[in-house]
């Protein structure tokens, strides 16, 4: 916490979610069912590249289910996006049967998540907030941080897909 003052909060969580195209008939309604379809190699799945944070979370989910990403990619079951927008676009357009994105990106793209990854699957995506020790106006920063903790602010954040903590 070097550089942080006495006020540090775990502010928001962005869930890692599974989405499918609208009207999908593949029966993918959970990460468990996704894993079964990937094992059967009967779907096309989109995830972020390994240098994209959501791709790294997806790799952890694949490992959680003992799925071999390289083998699935070689079998033509996985397609990649160089950023999360590419993943949401492939899902929205129905180019793939399922994909993993952040809840906020699903919201922005008009996608409805069918499942949320648990912390055991891939950890948590946490956004902290803090008042810096070197803040030129620490009192105003503390007041703003206090505002961020209100129900009003939580409603705004939750309205775009975040989970207030």
Regions found by a protein language model. Give the residues of each.
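Hydrophobic/proline-rich hinge and linker segments of small-molecule sensing/allosteric domains
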Residues: 11-30
């Amino acid at each position: 916490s070097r550089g942080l003052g006495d006020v540090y909060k775990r502010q928001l969580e962005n869930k890692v979610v599974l989405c499918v195209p609208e009207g999908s008939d593949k029966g993918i309604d959970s990460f468990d069912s996704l894993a079964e379809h990937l094992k059967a190699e009967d779907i096309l799945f989109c995830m972020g590249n390994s240098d994209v944070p959501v791709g790294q979370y997806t790799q952890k989910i694949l490992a959680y289910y003992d799925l071999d990403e390289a083998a699935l990619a070689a079998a033509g079951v996985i397609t990649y996006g160089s950023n999360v927008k590419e993943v949401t676009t492939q899902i929205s357009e129905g180019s793939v049967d399922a994909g993993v994105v952040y809840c906020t990106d699903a919201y922005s793209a008009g996608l409805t998540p069918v499942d949320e990854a648990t912390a055991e699957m891939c950890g948590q995506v946490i956004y902290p907030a803090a008042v810096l020790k070197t803040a030129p106006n620490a009192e105003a920063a503390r007041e703003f941080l206090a505002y961020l903790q209100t129900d009003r602010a939580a409603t705004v954040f939750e309205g775009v897909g975040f989970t207030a903590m």
